[in-house]
């Protein structure tokens, strides 16, 4: 794949990511203001997450047969449709009708998100070259920049809601993304990532032990984040602390932007160490941080002290989570074969989406049952399971072939 096509794929992915982050904040804050319960708000996002599971499985297979450029264009188009559809929901509707309608529209957005993400991340494999160092750095830059832009999207969504209202914000995003779609569709050329061998449909579930184990770890890692992030923390900031739309959106935006920045610089932070050892060490560190935040909330400190403990603790959580996520994003490409990269990545991100679905549901349920404290204990348990799963990750193919595994003397290590 030439660099021009890669730039177009990445630009399309970035534009989509802005609308994706903004839409999440729009929906969450809008329906919280309408008086929907934490569980009802969680259900609004379940269609989005559930379709992500299916899309990653099937989308990777479709991408390998038709080319990643086509899956990207379809993803952008579906997001435009979802944004416009959401603008037709009326406040006068019964709550159950609104929940079902928004879930359905969000399901389209979930398909769109994972088609574009799978397309962009799989494309990295075809432009990075054979060196693991280049691959890791390009994955880190793409993933980090995506999350930074998603954070900007969070703030953008909150700002658009406060300034223009729900419907106008949706239409504005649909128009901008439509322009992006036209540019990408007319300028993108070739069949990016099209497999030379037509893999059968059953290949979407035929994975190596390494990919299965990494996917299981990814499931629990992302579920652990969304347990506190998706519903519990925003409602806590809005209802308990009384923050404004700008405050809630601003903090979540800053968190995701910082998280993305750390991901982009992950190769520098991690140094010259084995990816597998680093994944184990940083997941254990994340579990300890989660437990400390939960203990601080349970300690019945003053409101100001509790707020400082939660917010500062979650900032540290974000740094360590970003390192874990970046390591996983590198490992899936390192474990993948060139001719199966889109199906391997699709399977892996279907596990990611399944984790987000479970985390989203638990975020609403645990917050309803025990507030932010119980949500944080749920996070701790899921991160601990992630750590246990990383203990069984095998060496990457490059490491297995390496006659000199010492990272201090081998110049070909990924973290250089």
Which role does the model predict for each range below?
Residues 55-68, 161, 261-278, 367:
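Helix-to-loop junctions at the C-terminal end of transmembrane segments
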Residues 1-50, 212-252:
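Helix-loop boundary and gating motifs at the non-cytosolic
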Residues 53-91:
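Conserved MFS/SLC helix-loop-helix module at the cytosolic interface between two early adjacent transmembrane helices
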Residues 105-146:
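Cytoplasmic helix-loop-helix junction between adjacent transmembrane helices
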Residues 278-328:
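C-terminal transmembrane helical hairpin of 12-TM major facilitator-type secondary transporters
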Residues 14, 82, 95-116, 307-323:
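Hydrophobic core of transmembrane alpha-helices in multi-pass small-molecule transporters
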Residues 1-3, 187-224, 239-240, 410-416:
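Juxtamembrane intracellular "pre-TM" segments in multi-pass secondary transporters
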Residues 77-95, 286-303:
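C-terminal ends and interior cores of transmembrane alpha-helices
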